[in-house]
Swiss-Prot record:
Parts of the chain that traverse the membrane: 20-40, 78-98, 108-128, 174-194, 196-216
Organism of origin: Chlorobium luteolum (strain DSM 273 / BCRC 81028 / 2530) (Pelodictyon luteolum)
The protein's name in its UniProt record: ATP synthase subunit a 1
Mode of membrane association: Multi-pass membrane protein
Phylogenetic placement of the source organism: Bacteria, Pseudomonadati, Chlorobiota, Chlorobiia, Chlorobiales
A Pfam match: ATP-synt_A
Length: 223
C-alpha cells in the first residue's frame, strides 16, 4: 500500500522524476481550466440567461458573502484566489471516488505548496491594501516586542495549514484502504461517503483560514 502518490514514479531521468502526485495535479488543473473555460464561454448580461449561469451566479454570490462575513468587504478582489484554492482542494478530494485515484492533497508536497501560496498571498494582499509601511507595522503591534512572535506565528500557521490538510486526507485514504481488505463491502462504501464529506470540509476550512489570514493582513488600513 502506498502512503501517497509521491511513491509511484511514472518517469525518471537522473534526478528528474515524474511521480503520480505531479501527474495527477496537472491533470486536475487541466480539467479545472477546461471546465472553467467551457462554463464561462457563453455568459450573458441580458434578461434571458441559461440555467447553468443562474446556478453559477448563486454559487459566486454565496462565496462573496462568505468572504465579506470574514471581513473582506471588496470580495471580488479576493474571490479569484480564494475560490481557486477551494475548488482545487475540493475537486482533488472528491475525485477519490475514482478507483485507483491518489489525491494530490494526500501528499505533503502538494499541501505545502498550497500553504506556501497562502504565505505569499497574505503579504501581497496586505501591501496592496495598506502599503508596505502599513503592512509591516502590523508586525510590531500592539508593541514592538511582539515582532519575533508575529513572525513565528506567520511561519507556524503556514506549517499548520500544510500538515492539517495532508494529515486528514492521507489518514482517510489509509483507513479506507485498510477497511476494504478486512470488512464487508457496505462499510467501506459508507466510509467513502464520509470521506467525500470530510474532503469538502477540509477544502472549506483551508480556504476560510486563508481568508481570515488575508483579512488580518489588510486590517492595518482600517486601524
Amino acid at each position: 500500500m502506498h502512503l501517497s502518490g509521491d511513491e509511484i514514479i511514472i518517469w525518471q531521468h537522473g534526478f528528474v522524476k515524474l511521480n503520480l502526485t505531479i501527474a495527477t495535479t496537472w491533470a486536475l488543473m487541466l480539467v479545472l481550466v477546461g471546465g472553467s473555460a467551457f462554463a464561462s464561454r457563453r455568459l450573458s448580461n441580458g434578461m434571458h440567461r441559461p440555467r447553468w449561469q443562474n446556478v453559477l451566479e448563486i454559487i459566486v454570490g454565496m462565496a462573496r458573502r462568505q468572504i465579506e462575513e470574514v471581513g473582506l468587504r471588496r470580495s471580488m478582489q479576493y474571490l479569484p484566489y480564494l475560490g481557486t484554492l477551494f475548488i482545487f482542494i475540493a475537486f482533488s478530494n472528491l475525485c477519490t471516488i475514482i478507483p485507483g485515484y491518489e489525491p494530490p492533497t494526500g501528499s505533503l508536497s502538494t499541501t505545502a505548496a498550497l500553504a506556501m501560496s497562502v504565505f505569499v498571498a497574505v503579504p501581497l494582499f496586505g501591501i496592496a491594501e495598506s502599503g508596505l509601511g502599513g503592512y509591516l507595522s502590523t508586525y510590531v503591534k500592539p508593541t514592538p516586542i511582539m515582532l519575533p512572535f508575529n513572525i513565528i506565528s506567520e511561519l507556524s500557521r503556514t506549517l499548520a495549514l500544510a500538515v492539517r490538510l495532508f494529515g486528514n486526507i492521507m489518514s482517510g485514504s489509509m483507513i479506507l484502504a485498510i477497511l476494504l481488505t478486512v470488512t464487508p463491502f457496505v462499510f467501506p462504501v459508507l466510509m467513502s461517503v464520509l470521506g467525500l464529506l470530510t474532503g469538502m470540509v477540509q477544502a472549506y476550512i483551508f480556504s476560510i483560514l486563508a481568508t481570515v489570514y488575508i483579512s488580518a493582513a489588510t486590517r492595518a488600513r482600517k486601524e
